[in-house]
Amino acid sequence: MNYRLIATDIDGTLLDDEGNLPANTYQAAAYLEEKGIRLVLCTGRPLLGVLKIYDDLKLTSPVVTNNGAMVYLSKNGPLIHNETMSIDDALHVIALNDIFNCTICMWHNNILYVSQLNKYAYDYAGITGVTPLLLDQIDLRKCDNGPTKFVFTDTLEKITSIRETAAKLSPSSVTAVTTRPYFLEFFSSSISKATALSKISEALGIKREQIISVGDGFNDIDMLDYAGFAVAAGNSHDEVKKHADMIACSNNEGVIAYIVENLIKK
């Protein structure tokens, strides 16, 4: 198959457990660039949390951020897809935290708002590279559009214990899914990485069967199902692996290099 695009999740897939790029990923990315195969970052992160990785790998490809809510044809744009939650749904999600008492992180117009400035907020902000503002500084009722997404963060034990209940209590138009074991994300159910890839396919004239998707998390499943060929990182949850055509090495060993050696060069 003449593959033209590899769509990869970042955390738990592209990056190792320490949040770094495995050494063999740089050479693999350079090989893909030389062959004209787009390496597309598809992540729950906002654009600002992607730029260093994008630049380190010397990419020129489109970028999918916020679980598919925003799609850029390159790091400098243009923005070809942008979808947000409704304000009513957003207010409902905020109210859920009266039950769960987690730290809320909310993205609105590429600004990060947090319910309190504590360890959890600063840890999340550190990953994204954005300085957070307090949530009480914005009144969603007076905004023209809703937020892109929410992240509830706390201990692994708490997030694990509330995940299913939070999903049941969320509006039907909102998806609640863990993107890291200690991050529970809420976003519009019409948002998906698969939808984002379809926008890129249309813009670049790339067919689904020419796309490889790779991920490790539950929020990657729709992307794996969309692509012509699906790869799960070796560290993926067993349920995610059921959606894969190939099980690669773990994220610590360089998943993209594994795909290049075992699929692209074959």
Each language-model region and where it sits:
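Short active-site oxyanion
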Residues: 36-40, 60-61, 148-149, 209-210, ...
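Asp-based phosphoryl-transfer active-site loop
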Residues: 2-18
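Mg2+-dependent phosphoryl-transfer enzymes with acidic/Ser/Thr/Gly-rich catalytic loops
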Residues: 1-5, 21-22, 185-266
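Short, structured coil segments at secondary-structure junctions
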Residues: 57-59, 66-67, 75, 169-172, ...
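Active-site phosphate-binding/coordination module
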Residues: 18-121
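Conserved acidic, metal-coordinating active-site core of Asp-based
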Residues: 96, 100-214, 218-222, 235
